[in-house]
Regions:
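Acidic donor-binding loop at a coil-to-helix junction in glycosyltransferase catalytic cores
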Residues: 231-237
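Conserved donor NDP-sugar-binding/catalytic core segment of glycosyltransferases
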Residues: 146-184
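Catalytic beta-strand/loop signature of glycosyltransferases that borders the donor
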Residues: 167, 248-255
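Short, well-formed alpha-helical segments that are part of the catalytic scaffolds
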Residues: 7-21
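Short aromatic/hydrophobic "clamp" motif used to bind/position activated sugar donors
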Residues: 134
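Acidic donor-binding segment of Leloir-type glycosyltransferases
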Residues: 20-111
Length: 324
C-alpha cells in the first residue's frame, strides 16, 4: 500500500482495517509513505505503530519527526504499554479483528523523503515484502472480507498462475466499510478470467484490476518491477510480464470496493491523451500489438479522453462497466 499527503486519513484507516479484518489475514502489511504526510495521516499511522510495537524503527522515526502529539505517550513510544483496553479505546475495530484471528500481523511503515509517484513507492515496498505472494491495495479502497481467502484458495489449485485479480465494485461517497460501500455501488469493473481471454484482451485494455491483484514477487521483479509510464504503470507491468510468459487469471467474485470520486476527470485531458498514445506506441514498438491493432483502439481512447467529463463519465458507467 502507498499513501501520500493528499489522501483522506479516514479512508486510510478504513483501508487498513479492511486488510487486517480479512478472514485469512496477511502475515505482514507494508505501508509506503510517498513523501511527507499531513499530521492527520501520520496520526492514523501512529495508531497502527502502537498496535504493532515490534516495529520499533517506525516509532523512533515518528518520535524524531516530532509527532508526539498524535496520541503517543512516552511509554507508548517505547512500545511496552500497548494494552488491549487502550487499543480498543483508540480503535474499536481492533477487538473485532482479534475475534477473526489470533495471528500476529507484522506492520511495516516505509517512509520516502520525497513524493516520487506510485510506481517508485510500490517498488520500494516490494523490497520490504518478505513473502512471495503479495496482495496489492490502494489506501482509499476497501477489500472484501474474504478477498485474500478466495484468492489463496484459487492459487492453491492453480499453481501455474503468477498474477490474480477479480471484479471491482465501484462506488462514490465516503463509506468506511464494505457493507456501506455496497449500498453505494454504481458499477462493476470486470475482467476476463482465463489466460486465453486475457492474452487477447491485453492488446486493447488493461486485463488485471491492479487495486485487488495478488502476484508473485519474483515474477514482478524479473519483469523489471514498476517502471515510469504515467497513468499506465500497472498495465505496462502486465505487458512486460506477459512477454515473459507469465500466467494471469481473474476471479468473477467482487474482491474490492473502489472509490471513483473524480476518477473520470483524471482520465481526461490533453496530457492523458498524450500518455495514451505514448503507451500504445510502446506496445507497438515492443511488438505486443500490430499497427492494425494499435490504430483503432488508440484513436478511440484518445477521443474518449478528450470528451467533456460528463460524457466520459456516462460512457464509463453505462457502456464500459457492468451495471449493478
Amino acid at each position: 500500500m502507498s499513501v501520500y499527503q493528499k489522501e483522506n486519513p479516514e479512508y486510510l484507516r478504513a483501508a487498513v482495517e479492511s486488510v487486517l479484518g480479512q478472514t485469512v489475514p496477511p502475515e505482514e502489511v507494508v505501508l509506503v509513505c510517498d513523501g511527507p504526510l499531513t499530521e492527520a495521516l501520520d496520526g492514523v499511522i501512529a495508531e497502527y505503530v502502537r498496535q504493532f510495537p515490534e516495529n520499533s524503527e517506525e516509532i523512533m522515526n515518528l518520535r524524531e519527526s516530532g509527532l508526539q502529539g498524535n496520541g503517543l505517550s512516552e511509554n507508548d513510544q517505547q512500545g511496552d504499554t500497548c494494552q488491549q483496553g487502550k487499543i480498543q479505546g483508540k480503535n474499536p475495530q481492533e477487538s473485532q479483528r482479534q475475534e477473526n484471528s489470533n495471528q500476529k500481523v507484522i506492520f511495516h511503515v516505509i517512509r520516502l523523503t520525497e513524493n516520487g509517484g506510485l510506481g517508485k513507492a510500490l517498488n520500494e515496498g516490494l523490497k520490504h515484502c518478505s513473502c512471495e505472494w503479495i496482495a496489492r491495495m490502494d489506501t482509499d479502497d476497501l477489500s472484501a472480507p474474504d478477498r485474500c481467502e478466495k484468492q489463496l484458495k484459487f492459487l492453491e489449485k492453480h499453481l501455474e498462475v503468477d498474477a490474480l485479480s477479480g471484479t471491482i465494485a465501484e462506488f462514490q461517497g465516503d463509506a468506511l466499510d464494505g457493507k456501506t460501500a455496497e449500498t453505494a455501488v454504481i458499477s462493476y469493473k470486470t475482467v476476463p478470467e482465463t489466460q486465453k481471454e486475457i492474452a487477447a484482451y491485453i492488446k486493447q485494455r488493461n486485463p488485471i484490476n491492479h487495486p485487488c491483484v495478488m502476484f508473485r514477487k519474483s515474477r514482478v521483479e524479473s519483469a523489471g518491477g514498476y517502471q515510469p509510464c504515467p497513468y499506465f504503470e500497472d498495465y505496462d507491468l502486465w505487458v512486460r510480464m506477459y512477454k515473459n510468459h507469465a500466467v494471469f487469471a481473474n476471479l468473477p467474485d467482487t474482491l474490492l470496493y473502489m472509490r471513483i470520486n473524480g476518477m473520470h476527470q483524471r482520465r481526461g485531458g490533453i496530457r492523458y491523451a498524450k500518455c495514451v498514445i505514448d503507451f500504445r506506441m510502446k506496445m507497438y514498438r515492443d511488438r505486443v500489438i500490430t499497427f492494425g491493432e494499435f490504430l483503432p483502439m488508440t484513436v478511440v481512447r484518445v477521443l474518449v479522453s478528450l470528451m467533456p467529463n460528463s460524457l466520459r463519465r456516462f460512457l464509463y458507467e453505462k457502456k464500459l462497466r457492468k451495471q449493478q
